[in-house]
């Protein structure tokens, strides 16, 4: 299995033929691997580098300062800072199965902290920001990155509509509103021995809740995706270019397509080059993820186009917010 690298400019400014070629390649890449890489998407190398600098500036704040905008545990969209170990992703997809209730097992630990925001206009679940005097320019920079990421995500959904011969807006109209989220991740340095112990991982195998995810990652390594040709195996996904984005399918798109497209199971663990060196320390890792989400009151049950007598609905008809609440309740 391989991850295809697609040139977004072919869709954004290409001819009709190039747009269709990109669309079909996107669908094929998603169907084969659940993931693709995206280049020429509009973010320059300098802008992605600045994004990682904003990540560093935030997580360099003291825990006491970050705690002033801490996320409140519970079944709701996350906002603000979550400390190392607050989230328990090891409970989300035990045995590769997507859990909708918390399994009755001891939760393994996550060795990461993160900061989450939603849209600036969201009054139902408002954002929590550090004081601008402590980290000048942080909020407007992330708000701008959020909006541009949403634009790219909508364009990718338009491409899928084209490739799957769906009515215009079949996916995009369900994603309007105040639901998508942006997350900064920081994985502090950790020993290989700790990660090999089986009780702690940087992030455990899981699928994302939303429609699709755009991920920018640094060069530390450790991101791995499930090999669909050999589901017990995970394949490393290294960064080949500063500005590339890794794009994966989330639970919602799997549900909308009635399982035709499968959410991409992934994890962050010990980089392959030091996996057998138990005395080594894994460097801190940083990543930034944009999660395209459905409107909170939209159904995440299968679309009618994917349900037939021979392919009955595999997923229940519940709202996007109810689905997120079920999944979020598992990790806290």
UniProtKB/Swiss-Prot annotation:
It is an enzyme of class 1 (oxidoreductase). Pneumocandin B0 is the starting molecule for the first semisynthetic echinocandin antifungal drug, caspofungin acetate. Pneumocandin B0 is a minor fermentation product, and its industrial production was achieved by a combination of extensive mutation and medium optimization. Inactivation of three of gloP/GLP450-1, gloO/GLP450-2, and gloM/GLOXY1 generates 13 different pneumocandin analogs that lack one, two, three, or four hydroxyl groups on 4R,5R-dihydroxy-ornithine and 3S,4S-dihydroxy-homotyrosine of the parent hexapeptide. Binds 1 Fe(2+) ion per subunit. Its cofactor is Fe(2+). SUPFAM superfamilies: Clavaminate synthase-like. Pathway: Mycotoxin biosynthesis. The keyword Transcription regulation does not apply. Disruption phenotype: Abolishes pneumocandin A0 production, and 3S-hydroxyl-L-proline occupies the hexapeptide core's position 6, resulting in exclusive production of pneumocandin B0. One of its GO terms (molecular function) is dioxygenase activity. Its EC number is 1.14.-.-. 2-oxoglutarate-dependent dioxygenase; part of the gene cluster that mediates the biosynthesis of pneumocandins, lipohexapeptides of the echinocandin family that prevent fungal cell wall formation by non-competitive inhibition of beta-1,3-glucan synthase. The 10,12-dimethylmyristoyl side chain is synthesized by the reducing polyketide synthase gloL/GLPKS4. The thioesterase gloN/GLHYD exclusively interacts with gloL/GLPKS4 to maintain turnover of the polyketide side chain. Belongs to the iron/ascorbate-dependent oxidoreductase family. This is 2-oxoglutarate-dependent dioxygenase gloC. It comes from Glarea lozoyensis (strain ATCC 20868 / MF5171).
